[in-house]
């Protein structure tokens, strides 16, 4: 049975840090006494048909240890941090009721932040408003949309780059739906600390001491994805006819760069370089977020015994001296 003092554990890290393999190592180490079920904390893995570019666990891997929040949305749909918190909270309760330990694994730091800190009481996504904003962006560009955001919500515009289309769109959507700037929602949370499903004290992280090590793995993985048919995967998604470049699913790292190349905005020969560069930038943001969480238990993922260190730390957290 899971320890009462630990409702769940979390494993975070930048892309290509080895989270999937580490999660299986944790599950194997605890299995003799405590079964584990994995809750994905990844905004790309929620989408069906996006397998290669997301490094989605294979069906065999998902059968080996139960996985949740994978393949739960069509790429045409959105999936918000608020929906994630609702789903993850429900799953944590259900998994514990089965006598297992929930292990939340991923790199979408916005989801972890919402889970640990509570979520701002913002309005839900509005498809009609988003469609109008996308049409406006097609006419004036995202730099023009950024200027519009600066008019209605200067603090949010100041922290967003003019090319950050996804966040600019969301900020303008909040303004149009609620009549309030996004920045005004950042002072209150809807969930009290005592009611949150878990805290950052149960967060383990994989972080490289040598950034070059991670950069090498990112490059190796992107080239492997291309060799595995990633571009064909994007072509199949485009062939549906109902997807476009501004959807959250198609803004995922790798997919966005592939879509741009297929649109002729960049030479196809530049796709590996641009995809790797975008993935490195994502990893940099992920590491920055992790380092802002002083309660985390950090493991150097580039250490030769990283997996052994992680398993030992997890066992100590779960069972203390009885590990």
Curated annotation (Swiss-Prot):
Domain of life: Bacteria
Cited function: Catalyzes the transfer of a dimethylallyl group onto the adenine at position 37 in tRNAs that read codons beginning with uridine, leading to the formation of N6-(dimethylallyl)adenosine (i(6)A).
Keywords in alphabetical order: ATP-binding, Magnesium, Nucleotide-binding, Transferase, tRNA processing
Region (Interaction with substrate tRNA): 42-45, 166-170, 251-256, 284-291
Gene Ontology process terms (BP): tRNA modification
Protein name per the record: tRNA dimethylallyltransferase
Binding residues for ATP: 13-20
EC number: 2.5.1.75
Keyword check for Phosphoprotein: no
Record has Magnesium as a keyword: yes
Reaction(s) this enzyme catalyzes, per UniProt: adenosine(37) in tRNA + dimethylallyl diphosphate = N(6)-dimethylallyladenosine(37) in tRNA + diphosphate
GO molecular function: ATP binding; tRNA dimethylallyltransferase activity
Cofactor: Mg(2+)
């Amino acid at each position: 049975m899971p320890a009462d003092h630990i409702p769940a554990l979390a494993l975070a890290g930048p892309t290509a840090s080895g989270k999937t393999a580490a999660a299986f190592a944790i599950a194997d180490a605890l299995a003799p006494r405590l079964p584990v079920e994995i809750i994905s904390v990844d905004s790309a893995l929620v989408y069906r048909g996006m397998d290669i570019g997301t490094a989605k666990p294979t069906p065999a891997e998902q059968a080996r240890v139960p996985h949740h929040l994978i393949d739960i949305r069509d790429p045409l749909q959105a999936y918000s941090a608020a929906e994630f918190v609702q789903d993850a909270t429900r799953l944590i309760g259900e998994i514990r009721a089965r006598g297992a330990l929930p292990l939340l694994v991923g790199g979408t730091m916005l989801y972890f932040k919402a889970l640990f800190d509570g979520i701002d009481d913002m309005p839900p996504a509005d498809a009609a408003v988003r469609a109008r904003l996308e049409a406006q962006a097609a006419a004036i560009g995202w730099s023009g949309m950024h200027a519009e955001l600066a008019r209605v919500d200067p603090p949010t515009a100041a922290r967003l780059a003019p090319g950050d289309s996804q966040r600019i769109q969301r900020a303008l959507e909040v303004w149009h739906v609620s009549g309030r700037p996004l920045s005004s929602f950042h002072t209150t949370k809807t969930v009290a600390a005592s009611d949150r499903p878990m805290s950052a004290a149960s967060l383990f992280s994989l972080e490289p001491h040598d950034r070059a090590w991670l950069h090498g793995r990112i490059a190796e993985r992107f080239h492997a994805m291309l060799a595995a048919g990633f571009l064909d995967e994007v072509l199949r998604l485009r062939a549906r006819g109902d997807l476009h470049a501004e959807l959250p699913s198609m803004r995922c790292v790798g997919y966005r760069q592939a879509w741009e190349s297929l649109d002729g905005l960049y030479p196809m020969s530049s796709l590996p370089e641009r995809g790797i560069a975008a993935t490195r930038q994502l990893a940099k943001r992920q590491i920055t977020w992790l380092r802002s969480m002083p309660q985390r238990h950090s493991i150097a993922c580039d250490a030769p015994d990283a997996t052994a260190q992680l398993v030992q730390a997890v066992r100590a957290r779960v069972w203390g001296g009885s590990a």
